């Protein structure tokens, strides 16, 4: 008896030291939760047992010392086998599970000790009690563990009783006896109800277990033999009477410990993103996890779990992931399973009549689409055909047939460099914008344009002309197509597809000679020296000489004046505007036409005879020479009195 009291004092002292350590360990601040992808370097399994956070193996892989797991090499199993141990309580781990919606605390199953009496040769005749070491003291201050109500005290043996004790007194116990009157079959099939086996439930209000004591109640200890007692989960408790030697040989019993993780610290709880819940409140299927208050052993705490439809670890950021209910067995039957966040839905299966309706709808939609596309195609075809017919009519009206006739008459000597489309010229001149106008004359308006290849051109859009004046336009085209002289503006091409005919010339950047002689402005900064005036006169004379003598057919300009003399970038003279020009054959000395030209530059004999000759162009050139020398206009009100 004295030995028993001494042992109890030793247990109390050991428990006091352990309690002080727990108090110190519990004062540390709760660290922030790790990310679900941040602990990939941590080993999360040992000996086939999954080790989820807050448990962990190795530094920085567990929450605190209570959750540290040590992966040791087994001494009893095969070579190289590892087994997990909870460091603080020095117990081998069987499995660990996280809280869920059904059970608000986590569960860890450990291997607990088996207390025996009379099961070895050394103690087979002993009459004293035997007590297990206090290694089930898992519920001290700061400990997250507690014995769940799924455990019970089991004793197997004859003439003995088992007592479970805590730091204060005995908590509970049970007693078994053996009767020789029962047959062997009755013993094997009997339940653990007092005959050779007894068990007792553990009250949750007294959870601090120090050890299990076995005492002999029989006067003949040697006859009763081996007895064992242990704590175990009810699932592992013996359903039928089993020989105590089997439990003694096994050396352990599976004990269920509940564990909680106090997340009342908002610094830890908020990053989890879990919804705060109260008991029996509802949550959305989009809420992956929930946290709620619970109460145990005089202390309230908050615990988290993955909601229904999600799985994973609620103590990790983004640790709860959606369960795809459609992958495995589902309750949709013949319907189609559609996975959704936290749940799933069953869509009705499309039957054959419904398929026919869908196919019919698709065909109708396709038919309508093809009909609309056909209408659009027909509209584009008609529009294109109309444009082609309109362009042909414009070509015919603008003298296209007359131009072809002229080409045949000239034996193919006309070399048209390019035929422009109306679309191309509209783009080049911004649809003949007024901002692009370079000048206007008796024959039309000239626009500045830029072709697609970047070349700057002058686009002359003729005024609306009747069929009687169409010959003048074609005449200008034919004449300029024959001319190839550096002092005559070159025709680049024409367009007859527009409402009015269009000619495209090379662009002459410095305007006409009239402005240089008579208009004083900041832009006219070029000095018209005598050398320049002489050079311009020579260049004009050369151009007239070419037209009168060197061209394949002699050409009379009939409107030589300073406004028709353009200046290029080097201020070289370029004769332009051939709208009133005429070509003559060798047998024809003159043409009788309407009066053409500009007053002040016209030959007086032309008024009397109406016969225009090369001398008429020379007379107009003489007026230009006087204009170059004197700087005076041919007609001036200042000279009327003189």
Swiss-Prot record:
Extracellular side: 29-357
Cytoplasmic compartment residues: 379-642
Membrane association type: Single-pass type I membrane protein
Protein kinase domain span: 432-642
Location in the cell: Membrane
GO molecular function, one term: polysaccharide binding
TM spans (from-to): 358-378
Tissue: Slightly expressed in the whole plant.
SUPFAM superfamilies tied to this protein: Protein kinase-like (PK-like) (SSF56112)
InterPro entries: Kinase-like_dom_sf (IPR011009), Prot_kinase_dom (IPR000719), Ser/Thr_kinase_AS (IPR008271), WAK (IPR013695), WAK-like (IPR045274), WAK_GUB (IPR025287)
Cited Pfam families: GUB_WAK_bind, Pkinase, WAK
Record keywords, A-Z: ATP-binding, Disulfide bond, Glycoprotein, Kinase, Membrane, Nucleotide-binding, Phosphoprotein, Serine/threonine-protein kinase, Signal, Transferase, Transmembrane, Transmembrane helix
EC number(s) from the headed UniProt entry: 2.7.11.-
Record remark on domains: The EGF-like region is specific to this family of proteins and seems to consist of the C-terminal of an EGF-like domain fused to the N-terminal of another one.
Family, per entry: Belongs to the protein kinase superfamily. Ser/Thr protein kinase family.
Protein name: Wall-associated receptor kinase-like 6
Organism: Arabidopsis thaliana
Lineage: Eukaryota, Viridiplantae, Streptophyta, Embryophyta, Tracheophyta
